[in-house]
Amino acid sequence: MNTLLSRANSLFAFTLSVMAALTLGCILTTAFKDRSAPVRLHVSRILLKKVEDFTGPRKKSDLGFITFHISADLEKTFDWNVKQLFLYLSAEYSTKSNAVNQVVLWDKILLRGENPKLNLKDVKSKYFFFDDGHGLKGNRNVTLTLSWQVIPIAGILPLVTGSGRVSVPFPDSYEIATTF
């Protein structure tokens, strides 16, 4: 009749088809879920320095430091198909030389099983907030936004922006303080 290899091939093909159908079912059950959540951001301190920029010509550039609070409940974002969330806080502003500037200031990976309720106080920016020039000094509209990338077990990777944003003005003068 059939050889052992042809029976094994049939079993493998059937198993692969069933696994593909189950994966498609997993994707369809969570593909259209709203993953947004309300976010509260508060900036408690802004420090602006004029520092040497070693990446280009020997000019000085603006370096901003931000201390902030984040409050968000991401519990409804997690379901059985979510492996982790990649959270990041970004700053968006415009200058004379660039219409749109976007800088990531802080990030965090939130795994399934960890506490999805964020209540972080006095968090300092994790990454440097450099502007290639002097676009931060006196800028009245630097908008901070918390966003997250949903990493599912199976399916697409949706990018979600939290509903809370905060716009902060930067100071008109540079700080001389040595520590932040």
UniProtKB/Swiss-Prot annotation:
The membrane-topology field of this record reads:
Single-pass type II membrane protein
Q: Which residues lie on this side of the membrane: Lumenal?
A: 33-180
Q: What is this protein called?
A: Signal peptidase complex subunit 3
The protein's assembly and partners: Component of the signal peptidase complex paralog A (SPC-A) composed of a catalytic subunit SEC11A and three accessory subunits SPCS1, SPCS2 and SPCS3. Component of the signal peptidase complex paralog C (SPC-C) composed of a catalytic subunit SEC11C and three accessory subunits SPCS1, SPCS2 and SPCS3. Within the complex, interacts with SEC11A or SEC11C and SPCS1. The complex induces a local thinning of the ER membrane which is used to measure the length of the signal peptide (SP) h-region of protein substrates.
Task of the protein = Essential component of the signal peptidase complex (SPC) which catalyzes the cleavage of N-terminal signal sequences from nascent proteins as they are translocated into the lumen of the endoplasmic reticulum. Essential for the SPC catalytic activity, possibly by stabilizing and positioning the active center of the complex close to the lumenal surface.
- Which family does the record assign? Belongs to the SPCS3 family.
Q: Name one GO biological process term.
A: protein targeting to ER
Keyword Endoplasmic reticulum appears in the UniProt entry:
yes
RNA-binding found in the keyword field? no
Q: Which residues form a coiled coil?
A: none
Q: Which domain of life is it from?
A: Eukaryota
Q: Give the main localization category.
A: endoplasmic reticulum
Q: Where in the cell is it found?
A: Endoplasmic reticulum membrane
Origin organism is: Rattus norvegicus (Rat)
**TM annotation in the entry:** 12-32
Q: Which residues lie on this side of the membrane: Cytoplasmic?
A: 1-11
**GO CC terms, sorted:** endoplasmic reticulum; signal peptidase complex
Q: Which UniProt keywords are listed?
A: Endoplasmic reticulum, Glycoprotein, Membrane, Signal-anchor, Transmembrane, Transmembrane helix
- Tell me which Pfam families the record gives: SPC22
- Carbohydrate-modified residues are 141
